């Protein structure tokens, strides 16, 4: 097999949670481009139908499983096996924060904090557990975290704490599942242009200020994240496990601070 052929995953079956739109949709389409049949999951059927249509346009089968991922992972895995007879890749993409809702940790309720952990961290744990139970011949689990989980994140501390937990969850799962041939990695996106992201920031000079903190000079796209997940899922990444890949155009805590100082001096 050539290096170029090693990114192909013809005949493999992937589950992508939170794939109704945005990053999850981009991941589903990237995996279909690489040869996978894809199980798509989200809460809104209309969104899932569009994602599934994109998978089919790429020449592969799609299965829609509508529902809230929390406490639903085992059912998604069951349906994937029933429909396709195998499960090779599981992408935990469900997550996020409440749009336009920010709190300092000192003023945050227990309910809000627990809700962020359930949505972002517990759902990933449940998904990984369901995947591992249905990968007898090995496979790949990819957790979608965030650059926010790699640094302090004022006003979105619960979200950041959950994503940091996801990165550690990945490292532990990688060690526990290695002997079974299951690789586990994390992709941590930086700022990516999606409907949800624009809903928080709006189309304004805020986006330009954010762009100035990114060394490569642009915001990310869903294709950027999809490509990273496709690689980590493929045989080309067969000796990579337990890693967190920051896909953020070079944006780190240091570059973010540098960008902020630059703006203040303009």
Give the positions of each predicted feature.
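Short C-terminal tail/terminal secondary-structure segment
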Residues: 2-6, 102, 151, 230, ...
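Alpha-helical segment proximal to the catalytic Tyr-Lys
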Residues: 133, 175-179, 238
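Substrate-binding pocket helix/loop in short-chain dehydrogenase/reductase
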Residues: 101-105, 109-114, 210
């Amino acid at each position: 097999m050539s290096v170029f052929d090693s990114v192909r995953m013809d005949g493999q079956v992937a589950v992508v949670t939170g794939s109704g739109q945005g990053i999850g949709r981009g991941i589903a389409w990237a995996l279909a481009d690489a040869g996978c049949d894809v199980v798509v999951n989200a809460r809104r059927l209309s969104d899932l139908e569009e994602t599934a249509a994109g998978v089919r346009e790429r020449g592969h089968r799609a299965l829609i499983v509508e529902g809230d991922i929390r406490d639903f992972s085992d059912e998604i895995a069951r349906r994937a096996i029933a429909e396709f007879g195998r499960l090779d890749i599981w992408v935990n993409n469900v997550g996020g924060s409440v749009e336009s809702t920010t709190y300092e940790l000192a003023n945050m309720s227990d309910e809000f904090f627990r809700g962020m952990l359930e949505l972002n961290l517990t759902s990933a744990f449940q998904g990984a557990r369901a995947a591992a139970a249905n990968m007898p011949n090995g496979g790949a689990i990819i957790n979608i975290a965030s650059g926010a989980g790699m640094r302090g994140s004022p006003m979105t501390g619960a979200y950041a704490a959950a994503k940091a937990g996801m990165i550690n969850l990945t490292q532990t799962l990688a060690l526990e599942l290695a002997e079974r041939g299951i690789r586990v990695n994390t992709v941590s996106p930086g700022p990516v242009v999606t409907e949800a992201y624009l809903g928080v920031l709006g189309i304004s000079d805020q986006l330009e200020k954010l762009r100035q903190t990114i060394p490569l000079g642009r915001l990310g796209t869903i294709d950027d994240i999809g490509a990273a997940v496709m690689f980590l899922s493929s045989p080309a990444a067969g000796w990579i496990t337990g890693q967190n890949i920051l896909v953020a155009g070079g944006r780190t805590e240091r570059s973010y601070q540098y960008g902020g100082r630059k703006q203040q001096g303009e």
